[in-house]
Regions:
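A contiguous, low-structure linker/loop signature
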Residues: 1-20
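Active-site loop segments of alpha/beta catalytic cores
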Residues: 18-248
Length: 248
C-alpha cells in the first residue's frame, strides 16, 4: 500500500508547520469535488455518502513526523507533540466540517486512528482523548465512528467520554471484553479476522469464526457483524456471502 513520507525531521521543525487550507490545498478539494460529482451515480446504485471521513490526529501526526519519532516524542518532547496535535486537530475539524457542509447527506464522523492503540492509559488521556473529543464535538452528527484495530482495550474504556457510539476494533479482542469496557451505549463493529479468515479462509471458516465470535454473547443488540479491521484485499464473494448469511 502507498505510505506518506515524513516531512518533519526534528521536533523543533514543528513550530514552522502551517495548517493547510482544506478548501484550496493539496488533493483535498479534488477529492471532495470528485465525491460531489459522483453523488448522483452513487445514489443511483442505492448508496449514500453518510460520513465525513479522515485519518485521526495521531495517525496524521505520525505521518508527518514518523511513527517512531512521534511515539518517542510523547515522552521526550511532549510540548512539541501537543503543538503538532493541535495543528492537525484544527485542520481535521475544518476538513470534517467542509465535507459535511458540501455533501448534505453526511450525518456522521468517521475517524481511523491506530496510533492511539500504542499509548498507555496516561498518555492516551493526555495525547489522544482531548484531540479526538474535540473533533467529534465539532459537529452535531448522529453517528460518531472510530476505527482502531491496534490494541483497543484502553480506547474502549473511554469511548463514552470521546462521544463515540460506533467502534471497529481488532479481532484479537473478544467482543465480550470490548462490550464490558465500552458499555451498552456503543455499537460494536467486528470482529472476525480480516486476512486469515475473510481473505484466506473458506466459507466454512467464516461461518465458524462468526459462531465463535458470538459464543457466550446473550445480547447481540448494538452489534454490526464485520471483520475486526479493514476489509482485506482478496476477500472472495463466497466468503462475503457467508458472512452475510451468518449475520442473518
Amino acid at each position: 500500500f502507498p505510505a506518506a513520507e515524513k516531512i518533519l525531521h526534528e521536533y523543533d521543525e514543528i513550530a514552522r508547520l502551517k495548517k493547510p487550507d482544506c478548501r484550496t490545498d493539496g488533493l483535498l478539494p479534488f477529492v471532495l469535488g470528485r465525491l460531489k460529482s459522483c453523488c448522483a451515480a452513487i445514489e443511483a446504485e442505492g448508496h449514500t455518502i453518510r460520513f465525513a471521513v479522515a485519518r485521526g490526529p495521531l495517525n496524521i501526526a505520525s505521518y508527518l513526523l514518523g511513527q517512531t519519532e512521534f511515539l518517542l516524542g510523547v515522552k521526550t518532547n511532549p510540548v512539541e507533540i501537543h503543538q503538532l496535535l493541535r495543528i492537525v486537530t484544527d485542520f481535521l475539524i475544518e476538513w470534517i466540517g467542509l465535507q459535511a457542509d458540501t455533501i448534505e447527506t453526511i450525518d456522521g464522523i468517521f475517524l481511523l486512528d491506530d496510533l492511539i492503540g500504542f499509548l498507555g492509559e496516561d498518555d492516551f488521556c493526555e495525547f489522544a482523548l482531548p484531540y479526538l473529543k474535540a473533533i467529534y464535538q465539532s459537529r452535531r452528527t448522529r453517528v460518531r465512528f472510530l476505527h482502531n484495530d491496534a490494541a483497543g482495550l484502553i480506547t474502549a474504556k473511554h469511548l463514552a467520554e470521546l462521544g463515540v457510539n460506533l467502534f471497529n476494533f481488532s479481532y484479537k479482542h473478544p467482543i465480550s471484553e470490548i462490550r464490558r469496557l465500552a458499555g451498552d451505549s456503543v455499537t460494536l463493529v467486528g470482529n472476525i479476522p480480516p486476512r486469515e479468515t475473510l481473505a484466506e479462509g473458506t466459507p466454512d471458516d467464516v461461518r465458524r469464526s462468526v459462531a465463535e465470535m458470538f459464543e457466550g454473547i446473550d445480547d447481540r443488540r448494538r452489534t454490526v457483524l464485520s471483520c475486526g479491521g479493514g476489509m482485506p484485499p482478496g476477500a472472495t464473494t463466497e466468503n462475503i456471502d457467508a458472512l452475510l448469511t451468518a449475520a442473518q
